[in-house]
């Protein structure tokens, strides 16, 4: 289809291709076996395709949606050869991703506004939350924006220390307090500091404990409420960070965090080390939240703005 034109730079596209290599190889291998010995898409092929999508961590709900769409095309066209299946899947998955990822961004951008753009970052410990914040700070700074970080995950000394390392590395200010301090107090101080400095972007880390949903909800609600005292409308974005390598566990994390607070965007990390990249498709569709960033490598440049067309192209090429 014509919308699969090249959007990324050659270097960025190569990084994405490399990061999705394990996912692509696994998926295409399974797809090849699903259509082996078949010349047309029939009920057996669709049953096999359903297994392929579910085992590729696309998720049952999204898989059934894709199968229904392909069934409709087969029914309409009467005959669809298995050789066309790759192309049809590309088109249907791109269309599905377009429903929640309407933009076509390729660069790290924020909306034009007078006040700082505030991003509150949520996610369980160990998913790459702090690293994602550090890489975001780097990318926004590289794009000419001034950035302030806030260490509101005050329950782990390591979280504050890790964020300090990233702040030093990217040469951006970090607002922090002692371990055990009130997270809302840190958020308040961070926004006050950012407003005084006339900063463009504020990124605030929050605690990643999931053992008690009510406590998590109350804590995040309080942090947001306190932010609004300094800056009405803040946070402008609530970014949920998920570890792509955990597959179905990422769905469970998304379920818990979307129940605890309003999540407006998702970052999926660690896709380079896994064959579970299908999780990006399922998470975005099932929760109707756009995927904004994906992590496709360990380097500071390997956090990319998610572009649905480039993702699908790398997934199926």
Which ranges hold each PLM region?
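Short, aromatic- and cysteine-enriched interfacial helices/patches
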Residues: 3-10, 28, 35-36
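Short beta-alpha junctions and helix-cap segments that line functional grooves
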Residues: 3, 105-107, 136, 252-254, ...
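Primarily NTPase-proximal linker/entry elements flanking Walker-type ATP/GTP-binding cores
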Residues: 17, 21-152, 159-179, 187-204
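Short hydrophobic/aromatic residue motifs in ordered secondary structure
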Residues: 60-62, 156, 272, 300
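Short glycine-rich anion-binding loops that position phosphate/pyrophosphate groups of nucleotides
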Residues: 207-209
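Switch/coupling subdomain of P-loop NTPase systems
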Residues: 4, 10-16, 21
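Residue-level signal for short, function-critical loop segments
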Residues: 153-154, 244
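Conserved catalytic-core segment of NTP-binding enzymes
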Residues: 162, 182-197, 211-317
């Amino acid at each position: 289809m014509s919308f699969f034109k090249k959007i990324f730079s050659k270097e960025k596209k190569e990084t994405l291709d490399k990061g999705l290599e394990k996912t692509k190889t696994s998926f295409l291998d399974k797809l090849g076996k699903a259509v082996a010995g078949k010349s047309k898409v029939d009920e057996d092929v669709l049953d096999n395709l359903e297994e392929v999508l579910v085992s590729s961590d696309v998720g049952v709900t999204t898989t059934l949606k894709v199968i229904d769409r392909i069934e409709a095309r087969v029914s309409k066209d009467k005959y669809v050869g298995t050789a066309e299946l790759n192309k049809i899947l590309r088109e249907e998955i791109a269309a599905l991703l377009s429903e929640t990822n309407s933009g076509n961004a390729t660069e790290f951008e924020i909306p034009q506004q007078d006040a700082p753009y505030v991003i509150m970052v949520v996610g369980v410990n160990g998913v790459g939350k702090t690293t994602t914040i550090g890489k975001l700070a780097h990318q926004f700074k590289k794009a000419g924006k001034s950035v302030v970080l806030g260490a509101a995950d005050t329950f782990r000394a390591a979280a504050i220390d890790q964020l300090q390392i990233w702040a030093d590395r990217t040469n951006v200010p970090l607002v922090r307090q002692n371990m055990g301090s009130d997270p809302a107090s840190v958020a308040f101080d961070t926004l006050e500091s950012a407003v005084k400095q006339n900063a463009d972007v504020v990124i605030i880390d929050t605690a990643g404990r999931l053992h008690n949903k009510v406590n998590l909800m109350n804590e995040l609600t309080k942090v947001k409420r306190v932010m609004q005292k300094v800056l009405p409308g803040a946070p402008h974005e609530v970014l949920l960070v998920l570890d792509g390598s955990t597959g179905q566990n990422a769905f469970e994390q998304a379920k818990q965090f979307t129940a605890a607070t309003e999540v407006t965007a998702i970052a999926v990390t660690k896709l380079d080390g896994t064959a579970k990249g299908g999780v990006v498709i399922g998470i975005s569709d099932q929760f109707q939240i756009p995927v904004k960033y994906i992590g496709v490598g360990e380097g500071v440049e390997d956090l990319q703005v998610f572009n649905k067309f480039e993702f699908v192209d790398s997934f199926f090429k």
